[in-house]
Amino acid sequence: ACHFRIMTDNPKAFIGLPEVNLGIIPGWGGVQRLPRVLGKSKALELILFSKRLTSAEALACGLVDKVVPAADLLAEATAFAQSLTKRPPLAVAAVLEGMSVGLDKGFDEGLKLDEAWTAKLAASKDAMEGMTAFLEKREPNFIGE
């Protein structure tokens, strides 16, 4: 599982879950994770029929977030990752944990966690830095505290 997915537009590149063709099911939680990304009907279609998708099809159904030329794939993924590292680490952690808990354990559990994170983040150095940087019209320098 991954939070973001970038795929090449190479016509030989496909994505799919072929395990049912072998008489087994997708490993590593594929049966549980795919419907959370695509919805039940599309996930069933891809898994039960071992359908392979081109990059355009994967993008259209939401399985990948972005399609780029093969020559740009590593640079694009690196730039994306570097951009993410500039985000406030505590807030990013809060969003990732809150979304996972909300999806896995339910809306109410997710809200409880959001409430706890909101209090923690409001008192953080990163929140102060973010607000100060905004008022001073400069880029923030987050430190994860």
Where does each model-flagged region fall?
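Hydrophobic alpha-helical segments typical of transmembrane helices
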Residues: 30-33, 42, 91-94, 114-117, ...
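Short acidic-aromatic low-complexity motifs
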Residues: 49-52, 125-129
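C-terminal long alpha-helix characteristic of the crotonase
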Residues: 6-13, 64-112, 119-125, 141-145
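Well-ordered beta-strand positions
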Residues: 4-6, 45-51, 57, 66, ...
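K/E-rich alpha-helical interaction surfaces of small helical-bundle regulatory domains
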Residues: 129-144
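CoA-thioester-processing core
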Residues: 1-47, 61, 76, 80
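Short, structured loop/turn "capping" segments at alpha-beta junctions
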Residues: 41-44, 53-60, 88-93
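Terminal peptide-recognition signature
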Residues: 34, 58, 95, 134
